[in-house]
UniProtKB/Swiss-Prot annotation:
GO BP term, example: protein import into peroxisome matrix, docking
Lineage, broadest ranks: Eukaryota, Viridiplantae, Streptophyta, Embryophyta, Tracheophyta
InterPro entries named in the record: AAA+_ATPase, ATPase_AAA_core, Lon_bac/euk-typ, Lon_lid, Lon_proteolytic, Lon_Prtase, Lon_prtase_N, Lon_prtase_N_sf
Pfam family, one: Lon_C
Annotated source species: Arabidopsis thaliana
Reactions catalysed according to its record: Hydrolysis of proteins in presence of ATP
EC number(s) per entry: 3.4.21.53
Main location: other
GO cellular component: intracellular organelle lumen; peroxisomal matrix; peroxisome
Annotated GO MF terms: ATP binding; ATP hydrolysis activity; ATP-dependent peptidase activity; serine-type endopeptidase activity
Name by which UniProt lists this protein: Lon protease homolog 2, peroxisomal
Length: 888
């Protein structure tokens, strides 16, 4: 509760825009502007004895006030302060001149306030200082002159509070006694209503009985929501009788609004029966309309829907269909079962972009190249194909370009490339995720006869994006499936065929829609699951995995700034040196893309965020104060500041004044911090050497949906009956490759000195077990043929394979090495694992041009035409055999 205080002759002024602080009210404000922060620092924060500041209402426009007096700043000087030349009695000419200098309209009366709670903070990453201040209004004052002290305003004031003698004299006035009694009666009635409705009000009753009446009016009215004009009116009510009269009027108005709301609720509930419970909200709306004399809501909504349909630009045949549906809707009652479904259908027709298209700007290929280079590092071949696509669109805008399908492992930038195409074309972008879609209705929509029917994802995407010519991304197109509900991939055949998508028919829409203006782009991890007819409608662009050098550049240019921004940090708080990023790439991640790398960087950022947050400190400024709790009330400050305002429950307000500040320190990541946060390294360069430490193990290269990988093959023998066992979750093709490899080795056993005589069986009395580690991962394909032969020769000869050598290739029964796919990804995988030598089929030499030069320069690539060439290079010192090919 506000107490009587003696005001100084000058007060620092904190302006409130369109908001008034009354005596006895408590607010919480957040100061962010330069002027308000400086005022709080100099007048409140830096002073041991917290003084008073003035709260002055300010209008946000240049119009004069109809209540009270508003002032305009001017120019002048007074005792070292830059005066704003305000005098209460200024002439109209002076006001007009001041208005030209500044539009702000300052009220002539304000309220002196004291700080109950004060805290300081630092915004990250900008470093801007902010203050949160809890203020209590004390007493009214009148502004005599308004000036400047640095960036904030100061005013020469006079108090408007009555002396004790004047107050005692007023209390003897019969009119004042009558007004006091009327105010208390009305206020008590309001408190009783609130107590019945909300089970609250006991504390407020105590205030009505204990707080002096001249202070109670301000405190009571401050808790109501009222207009700025009404707030100014209360502030200007210096005379106690006028103040009580206006307060009584406001309290009575609030009481009447509560009673009207109760009347409407009672009227609605009285009309409800058990079968009408579901229409409660609709009945309440009708009752409100009846009170206002307006009961044609449904008719207005239908009319608005009709106007919206007329403005949608539908083709003539579709407009006729829509009119029939609209006439049917007008004949129905809102309670009928089909009313809502018909209305939703018509709203879809009105919302679809039939003729609304993105305004395409003239294609600038140079700008498109710069955009692609800034958003994506590397991928030169892919970028060149996109530029070619854009060049054709520039020369022939209406050309039906191919449907581009980006194929590659996760995390290499397929989706972001599609977004870059949309930006280069100047079109809106919409993404449809097809992963796991097994229902044809997801593409074509559900028929309207079903409950819960809805349009397909294509039509829904066009409705969301709002234009008929967006760039539409069909994401994860290889992840669609099929079951008894249909095949979504087959439904996409019509969508991606330029001859058919002119009149795409969605089952829910039930009218043809032109998709020919849409630019379709697709993404996939693998080509094999895509049906051949659908694959034939798209142009495949392969995105291989990134090299370590490319990952390093991507991390430094894109990932680290993005991760720091997502965690509220900057380079001033966390620094990740290039050497540490390279360490993460080599020892903590082995992937084709960069998602795992980004997750590791995010882990470092989270750890840094914890360390920075722990630097916060608290400084107590005063004692014997209770904790502040109050409901939130919106408010704003003038001069660009931000205010969060709260009205504290009425009563005695003693609060602790505390301050907080943050002092972050920069963190530099080193190897110790890496191991502490990310744990011990997951990979090391000695893995291949450890795995190939014994005979019977070889290193192969395979291709997966996640890019190239290194695959170890282990073989061992035991006493048995000459049988072969295969483990590692293998497919039929790789099992046949293992059988073929064993047959070839048995046939050449004497040539490789694995048997003393040509007719000796190397499997005599023993079994062979071949295992592919990582047994939880399915494996298949013919490219492990040379790896299997090498492992078997190593087993039988007891000669270890070189640990720095990996290989890939299919072999025939006659020992020829056939070409395989995924050469670039496989070489990149070998580079990631620290492999120094790679054996490839000779006919794959043409694929080496796609491998980055930096990777090729760090590897020794050996081309093999026959299996003998592979074995010669797989073992240290070569693999001796007889120079006899008579069995070939």
């Amino acid at each position: 509760m506000a107490e009587t205080v003696e005001l100084p002759s000058r007060l620092a002024i904190l302006p409130f825009r369109n908001k008034v602080l009354l005596p006895g009210a408590i607010i919480r404000i957040r100061c962010t502007s330069h002027s308000s922060v400086t005022l709080v620092e100099q007048e409140l924060w830096q002073k041991e004895e917290k003084g008073l500041i003035g709260i002055l209402p300010v209008r946000d426009d240049a119009e004069g006030s109809s209540i009270g007096t508003m002032i305009n700043p001017g120019a002048g000087s007074d005792s070292g302060e830059r005066s704003l030349k305000f005098l209460v009695g200024t002439t109209d000419a002076q006001k007009s001149d001041a208005k030209d200098q500044q539009d702000l309209q300052w009220h002539t009366r304000g309220v002196a306030a004291r700080a109950l709670h004060l805290s300081r903070g630092v915004e990250k990453p900008s470093g801007r200082v902010t203050y949160v201040v809890v203020l209590e209004g004390l007493s009214r004052f009148n502004v005599q002159e308004l000036g400047k002290r640095g960036p904030y305003s100061v005013a020469r004031i006079t108090s408007l509070e009555m002396t004790k003698a004047e107050l005692e004299q007023v209390k003897q006035d019969p009119d004042f006694v009558a007004l006091s009694r009327q105010f208390k009666t009305t206020a008590m009635e309001l408190v009783s209503v609130l107590e019945q409705k909300q089970k609250t009000g006991g504390r407020t009753k105590v205030l009505l009985e204990t707080v002096p009446i001249h202070k109670l009016a301000d405190i009571f009215v401050a808790s109501f929501e009222m207009s700025f004009e009404e707030q100014l009116s209360m502030l200007d009510s210096v005379d106690l009788k006028v103040r009580l009269s206006k307060a009584t009027e406001l309290v009575d108005r609030h009481l009447q609004s509560i009673r009207v709301a109760e009347k409407i609720t009672q009227k609605v509930e009285g009309q409800l029966s058990k079968s009408q419970k579901e229409y409660l909200l609709r009945q309440q709306m009708r009752a409100i309309k009846e009170e206002l004399g307006d009961n044609d809501d449904d008719e207005d909504d239908v009319a608005a829907l009709e106007r919206k349909m007329q403005a949608a630009g539908m083709p003539s045949n579709i407009w006729k269909h829509a009119q029939r549906e609209l006439r049917r809707l007008k004949k129905m009652q809102p309670q009928q079962p089909g009313y809502n479904s018909s209305r939703v259908y018509l709203e879809l027709l009105a919302d679809l972009p039939w003729d609304k298209a993105s305004e395409e700007h003239e294609l600038d290929l140079k700008a498109a190249k710069e955009r692609l280079d800034s958003d994506h590092y590397g991928l030169a071949k892919v970028k060149q194909r996109i530029i070619e696509y854009l060049a054709v669109r520039k020369l022939k805008p209406d050309a039906r370009g191919p449907v581009l399908c980006f194929v590659g492992p996760p995390g290499v930038g397929k989706t972001s490339l599609a977004s870059s195409i949309a930006a280069a074309l100047g079109r809106k972008f919409v993404r449809l995720s097809l992963g796991g879609v097994k229902d044809e209705a997801d593409i074509r929509g559900h028929r309207r006869t079903y409950i819960g029917s809805m349009p397909g994802r294509l039509i829904d995407g066009l409705k969301r994006v709002g234009v008929c010519n967006p760039v539409m991304l069909l994401d994860e197109i290889d992840k669609t499936g099929s079951d008894v509900r249909g095949d979504p991939a087959s439904a996409l055949l019509e969508v991606l065929d330029p001859e058919q998508n002119k009149s795409f028919n969605d089952h829910y829409l039930n009218v043809p829609y032109d998709l020919s203006k849409v630019v379709f782009v697709a993404t996939a991890n693998r080509v094999q699951p895509i049906p051949p007819p659908l694959l034939d409608r798209m142009e495949l662009i392969e995105l291989p995995g990134y090299t370590q050098e490319e990952k390093l550049k991507i991390a430094m240019r894109h990932l680290i700034p993005r991760v720091l921004d997502q965690h509220g940090l900057s380079s001033e708080f966390l620094k990740i040196p290039e050497a540490m990023v390279k360490n993460i790439i080599q020892r903590y991640t082995r992937e084709a893309g960069v998602r795992s790398l980004e997750r590791n960087l995010a882990a470092l950022a989270r750890a840094a965020a914890v360390m920075v947050a722990e630097h916060e400190q608290s400084l107590p400024l005063s004692k014997d104060v209770q904790k502040l709790t109050s409901p939130l009330l919106n408010g704003r400050m003038a001069e660009g500041g931000e205010v969060e305002m709260e009205v504290i429950p009425m009563g005695v307000n003693d609060h602790e004044i505390g301050g907080t500040f943050q002092s972050p320190s920069a963190l530099v990541v080193d190897e110790t911090m890496l191991e502490k946060i990310l744990g011990p390294p997951r990979f090391d360069d000695s893995e291949a050497a450890d795995r190939v430490a014994s005979a019977g193990v070889s290193v192969g290269l395979v291709w997966t949906t996640f890019g190239g990988e290194v695959q170890f093959v282990e073989a061992t023998s035991m006493v048995g009956k000459g049988e072969m066992h295969l483990t590692g979750q293998l497919g039929d093709v790789i099992k046949e490759s293992a059988q073929l490899a064993l047959t070839w080795v048995r046939a050449r056993a004497s040539d490789f000195k694995l048997a003393l005589a040509g007719d000796m069986n190397v499997l005599d009395g023993r079994d062979i077990h071949i295992h592919f580690p990582a047994g939880a991962v399915p494996k298949d394909g013919p490219s492990a043929g040379v790896t299997l032969v090498t492992a078997l020769v190593s087993l039988f000869s007891q000669k270890r394979v070189r640990a720095d050598t990996a290989m890939t290739g299919e072999m025939t029964l006659r020992g020829l090495v056939l070409p395989v796919g995924g050469i670039k990804d496989k070489i990149l995988a070998a580079h990631r694992y620290g492999i120094k030598r790679v054996i490839l089929p000779q006919r794959n030499s043409k694929d080496l041009v796609e491998v980055p030069a930096a990777v090729l320069s760090s590897l020794e690539v050996i081309l093999a035409k026959r299996m003998e060439d592979v074995l010669e290079n797989a073992f240290e010192g070569g693999c001796p055999w007889r120079n006899n090919y008579s069995k070939l």
